[in-house]
Structure formats: C-alpha cells, structure tokens
Amino acid sequence: MNAGAYGGEMKDIVESVEVLDFDNYEVKELKNEELDFSYRKSIIQRKNYIVLTIKLKLKKGNKEEIKAVYEDLRERRNSKQPLNFGSAGSTFKRPEGHFASKLIEDAGLKGYHINDAWVSEKHSGFIVNKGNASYKEVMELIEYVQKVVFEKFEVKLETEVRILKD
C-alpha cells in the first residue's frame, strides 16, 4: 500500500521492503523502484506478499521544527478523525474529482449503521465499530454505502482498506 496524508506518502520515504512471497515461500527484498507505487497502491497488493520489514530513508532536521509539524498534524488528525472507536482507517479511496466523505454525507449516510457498524458521525469516510460489529455487518455497511452513493451520484467508491477473505 502507499499510505498517505497531509501531502506525504510512503513512497517518498521507503528505501526497501522485505517480503515473504506466499507463492514460493521465498523472502525477497524489493527496492523502492521495484515497488511500483501509485495512489494508495504498490506491487504488494498485486502479489501474494506479506511485508516482513521496511527500511525507511529519513532526513535529519531541526528537532523543534519536526516537533511543531508533528503537533500540528496530530491536532488536525484528532480534530477530524473518529479515534474514539475502532476502525481500519479511511474506508474509501478518493474518487477522481470528488471526496468520498462528502459523497457519503450528501447521500444522507453519515451516522447510518447496521447494528454496531457505523458510518462515523465525525468523518463519514470512516466505518467505525461502536461495540461488537461483525465482519459481516461491516461488509454489509460498506456495500450499502457503495450502492447508495452509486445510485445517487453514479460514482463508484473503491475501498481503501484491504479486505481479506477466507
């Protein structure tokens, strides 16, 4: 995955990744240029890989400036994201020309829920677990949100979270 937020992406700091290839049970090291990074994707999603280690290339900087940037980003994250409930993070990718959370909110789904699986009332781009939501309930909610948004706006919401099936 090529996670990113606030103008940065993992592709900018990953030097290499050690993976286990489940097709042949070999451990491989992949350099940044071999990872084929794109928006929220890398070769990891297309192959049968499990990430074992990541080597990052970080830059030295002024401690106080780094701390100030960290505090600013932490405050922005805390003010916008539903951190008081369990979630897998941002549920949907940003569709071209739109914001997933705005489409979901405009579709009237903010706060919609199936038992304990909820579209967050704080940020509608997140599906949260307000108790004991099951995998089935979360998947039903994701699929319902996708269906309603498509019916209202003809925009297909693609999941940002990686869904593993049996």
Can you annotate each of these PLM segments?
Residues 20-140, 147-148, 152, 156-166:
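Phosphate/pyrophosphate- and phosphate-bearing ligand-binding catalytic cores of soluble enzymes
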Residues 1-16, 87:
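A gly/ser-rich beta-alpha-beta helix-loop segment of oxidoreductase catalytic cores
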